[in-house]
A protein has these predicted regions:
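N-terminal secretory targeting modules
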Residues: 1-186, 358-369
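Serine-esterase "nucleophile elbow" of acetyl-processing enzymes
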Residues: 144-146, 152-228, 232-242
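Structural motif
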Residues: 153-155, 247-249, 281
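Active-site-proximal beta-strand/loop segments in catalytic clefts of secreted hydrolases
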Residues: 191-192, 222-225, 249-252, 283-286, ...
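A general structural detector for well-ordered alpha-helical segments in enzyme core domains, enriched
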Residues: 207, 263-267, 298-305
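Oxyanion-hole/transition-state-stabilizing segment in secreted/luminal serine hydrolases
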Residues: 211, 228-266, 270-274, 285-290
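A short helix->loop->beta-strand "cap" motif at the edges of active sites that frequently abuts
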Residues: 275-280
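Catalytic His-Asp segment of secreted/periplasmic serine-dependent ester chemistry enzymes
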Residues: 290-369
Length: 369
């Protein structure tokens, strides 16, 4: 008897309905609101005169490099907070394009995720998952258990441009400002693709977002994939921002150790001149050092900047050895490609870097009182 061949189903949603992504809202009482307007509060983003989501003024980004000019529109670190008594929250986003990766989930690069905020504690509610065939935007829905006034936070995509974002609520629902942060002066992060969030599975799994949720602190993510090279223009902009703590995660994108040496100490000196009282945390590359002399040289350069600061009387600096972050018993599981963290890697980074951020935040808060 001839063997019967069975068709292989390539759509997993037809096998497991729990993996289905809804592409239509099917709501007849939804009202959409533009998050660029009150009472929504945006964090980690710069709108400017053109009213476009970005992370810094275009004039600054354009003066740095073509990479920074392009990645400036990636909304890494962007958040919107609001409160409502609607029993569902929908989103409708408009995207000019969709960035695809072979080693980063689309939920991280292009998705949004929702948190409930209560008394400084953020509780994960849902990820708004982009459909697999998304090209220019999508809609998604999160249903809530009841109608009561609550504060929410939505995290923006890490590696995509967002032209418009609308929040959908049940018609007649109340809407107001969301809860503010305990530490409302933002922690400032500068660095590479890792700093930008590659390759987290959802936006809030970047290490900065994990720290922000843990410590109830605002933050600005100025990570630029392949484009963090310590240029004077970006250094001047970093120094112009009023930050609570500056996490200098600059190492990887310097084309070589010589470039890093020529730019790392000047970055510190320029920043410290404008911000004498802002704590600085230096982080060396997190890649596991395995017979790589260049990475060893880079670590020493970052450490030398830290030692220079200490030797010149600066007690508002600390150094984190990136090799130690991804070393140890579970060092093999922290990345997707020996460089970019997976969620376990970002959690590990948040644990180590977050401890230093917390120490520095408490020091500055004590000093301000």
């Amino acid at each position: 008897m001839a063997e019967t061949k069975k068709k292989i189903e390539d759509d997993i949603a037809k096998i497991d309905k729990n993996l289905e992504v809804k592409t239509t809202l099917e709501l007849d009482d939804v009202v959409f609101y533009d998050v660029k307007k009150a009472p929504f509060d945006l964090y980690g983003l710069y709108l400017g005169e053109l009213d476009v989501f970005k992370r810094m003024p275009e004039s600054v980004a354009n003066s740095v490099s073509t990479g920074v000019a392009s990645l400036n529109f990636n909304t890494a670190g962007g958040r919107v907070r609001f409160s409502t008594d609607s029993d569902y929250i929908a989103i409708k986003c408009v995207l000019p394009m969709v960035r695809n990766f072979s080693h980063m989930p689309r939920t991280g690069s292009t998705g949004f995720d929702l948190y409930e905020v209560e008394d400084g504690t953020c509780t994960y509610v849902k990820t708004f998952v982009p459909p697999k065939d998304v090209t220019d935007g999508y809609e998604s829905l999160a249903r809530l258990p009841d109608k009561r006034m609550r504060s929410f936070e939505i995290n923006f995509p890490l590696y995509n441009r967002v032209d418009e974002l609308y929040i959908g609520l049940r018609e007649g629902s109340r809407i107001d400002h969301g809860d503010r942060y305990k530490y409302d002066k933002p922690v400032l992060y500068y660095g590479s693709s890792i700093t930008q969030g590659g390759c987290a599975s959802k936006p809030s799994n970047s290490y900065q977002s994990i720290i922000s949720h843990d410590l109830d602190c605002d933050h600005i993510n100025l990570g630029f994939s392949g484009s963090a090279k310590g240029e004077k223009e970006i250094v001047d902009y970093l120094a112009s921002l009023d930050a609570s703590v500056f996490v200098c995660d600059y190492d990887y994108n310097a084309p070589n150790a010589e470039h890093l040496k020529a730019t790392h100490l000047p970055l510190y000196l320029a920043y410290r001149e404008k911000n004498p009282d802002t704590p600085i945390i230096f982080v060396s590359g997190v890649k596991v050092i395995y017979r790589n002399e260049d990475l060893i040289k880079r670590r020493k350069i970052v450490f030398d900047t830290y030692m220079y600061a200490k030797e010149h009387g600066d007690d508002l600096v600390s150094f984190i050895d990136g090799h130690a972050i991804f070393g140890g018993r579970y060092g093999n599981v922290y990345t997707v490609d020996d460089a970019h963290p997976n969620d376990a890697g970002f959690l590990r980074m948040a644990d180590v870097i977050g401890r230093e951020v917390e120490i520095m935040l408490k020091r500055t808060a004590k000093k301000d009182t």
